């Protein structure tokens, strides 16, 4: 007697704890095997780029906080960097160091959220609590610097909003060895755990050629063996002053993406350590910026390395106080595109493991 199966449509989301945002995934399944996966996005679309056309350049900065709200500092920076490039504004050295410290602390905080929630999705409760314990220390540091805990609005065109308060650099220095010790504990608890490794090894695999054809960037690209990091390959700000490595793995699976992100935390700690040692004892935090910012007519595009990949900012200016056109290249949007390919033919139980390993933020996907 032949066993007959029946196709079924299964909705994951839009309200689901493992989607980490308002995201819907329509799965066509045959038994436990996925035949087709269709992502449905747009639930968090707010029209940021269109709104920006009616705002002055400085008024756009708070909107960038709300794209990838887990790494708001890098979003702030890419907009300011684009306007500074168009106008030829020179940023003071002290401000550049503050920017780098803020962005790298934000990168670690972002990866900690990913680590904790990813393992929670896989069934491990304790790492989630540990991750948020360490993240809280970073959030407190950034709160002292910017006055906010999540949407910082800290960067300014030409510099930063506030100088570092007294003793802040010393607190950052103390955080580095503390975080290194905790990171070692994470590896003992999870990375070397045989149950975890069997759960993610070989799952959600793609090749470097596929990664490039889908325009993947960041960890999702480097996990296939492509050594590409804009902080090294196209240095911006003062990243060319720091000695750090670009973590690369060859597997292209969930484990490779996990190991790349964990290694990135260590490299961010190296950058922070060097930035604290090199930090100028005094100096201005704002460059020479006109009272009313009017970018000259023309176009520019800049890109930087955010925690989820390359974030870019395109500005077309007609010489007014507002941009004629503003466009962000949002890495989560591009990284999500490979998901249907990864899920086809996979077991239903692997959906959450694969989605979590890509590490998307829906505010960034929808814009």
Curated annotation (Swiss-Prot):
Membrane topology value: Peripheral membrane protein
Q: Which family does it belong to?
A: Belongs to the complex I 49 kDa subunit family.
Leader sequence segment: none
Spell out the GO cellular component terms annotated for this protein, sorted alphabetically and separated by semicolons.
Answer: plasma membrane
Q: Return the InterPro entries for the record.
A: NADH_Q_OxRdtase_suD, NDH1_su_D/H, NiFe-Hase_large
In the UniProt record, the gene name given for this protein reads nuoD
Q: Which UniProt keywords apply?
A: Cell membrane, Membrane, NAD, Quinone, Translocase, Transport
Where is this chain's protein located in or outside the cell?
Cell membrane
Q: Which reaction does it catalyse?
A: a quinone + NADH + 5 H(+)(in) = a quinol + NAD(+) + 4 H(+)(out)
Q: Name one GO molecular function term.
A: quinone binding
- For this entry, the protein name equals NADH-quinone oxidoreductase subunit D
Which EC number(s) does the record attach to this protein? 7.1.1.-
Quaternary assembly: NDH-1 is composed of 14 different subunits. Subunits NuoB, C, D, E, F, and G constitute the peripheral sector of the complex.
Role according to the record: NDH-1 shuttles electrons from NADH, via FMN and iron-sulfur (Fe-S) centers, to quinones in the respiratory chain. The immediate electron acceptor for the enzyme in this species is believed to be a menaquinone. Couples the redox reaction to proton translocation (for every two electrons transferred, four hydrogen ions are translocated across the cytoplasmic membrane), and thus conserves the redox energy in a proton gradient.
Does the entry feature the keyword Glycosyltransferase, yes or no?
Answer: no
């Amino acid at each position: 007697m032949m066993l007959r199966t029946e196709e079924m449509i299964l909705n994951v989301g839009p309200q689901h704890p493992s989607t980490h945002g308002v995201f819907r995934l329509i799965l066509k399944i045959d038994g436990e095997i996925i035949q087709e996966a269709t992502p449905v996005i747009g639930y968090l679309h707010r029209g940021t780029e269109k709104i920006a056309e009616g705002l002055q350049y400085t008024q756009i900065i708070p909107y960038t906080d709300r794209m990838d709200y887990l790494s708001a500092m890098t979003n702030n920076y890419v907009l300011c960097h684009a306007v500074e490039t168009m106008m030829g504004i020179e940023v003071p050295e002290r401000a550049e160091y503050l920017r780098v410290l803020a962005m790298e602390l934000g990168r670690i905080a972002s990866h900690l959220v990913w680590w904790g929630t990813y393992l929670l999705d896989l069934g491990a409760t304790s790492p989630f609590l540990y991750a948020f314990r360490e993240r809280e220390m970073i959030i407190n540091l950034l709160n002292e610097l910017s006055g906010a805990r999540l949407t910082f609005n800290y960067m300014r065109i030409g510099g930063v909003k506030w100088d570092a308060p007294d003793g802040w650099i010393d607190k950052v220095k103390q955080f580095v060895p503390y975080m290194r010790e905790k990171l070692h504990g994470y590896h003992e608890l999870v990375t070397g755990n045989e149950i975890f490794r069997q759960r993610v090894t070989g799952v959600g695999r793609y090749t470097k050629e596929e990664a490039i054809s889908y325009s993947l960037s960041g960890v999702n690209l480097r996990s296939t063996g492509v050594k590409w990091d804009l902080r090294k390959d196209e240095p911006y700000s003062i990243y060319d002053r720091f000695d750090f490595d670009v973590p690369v793995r060859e597997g292209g699976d969930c484990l490779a993406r996990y190991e790349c992100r964990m290694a990135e935390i260590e490299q961010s700690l190296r950058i922070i350590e060097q930035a604290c040692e090199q930090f100028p004892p005094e100096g201005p935090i704002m460059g020479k910026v006109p009272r009313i910012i009017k970018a000259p007519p023309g176009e520019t595009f800049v890109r930087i390395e955010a925690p989820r990949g390359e974030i870019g900012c395109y500005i077309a200016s007609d010489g007014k106080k507002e941009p004629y056109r503003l466009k962000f290249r949002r890495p989560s949007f591009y990284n999500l595109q490979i998901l249907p390919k990864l899920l086809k033919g996979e077991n239903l139980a692997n959906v959450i493991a694969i989605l979590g390993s890509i590490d998307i933020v829906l505010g960034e996907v929808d814009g």
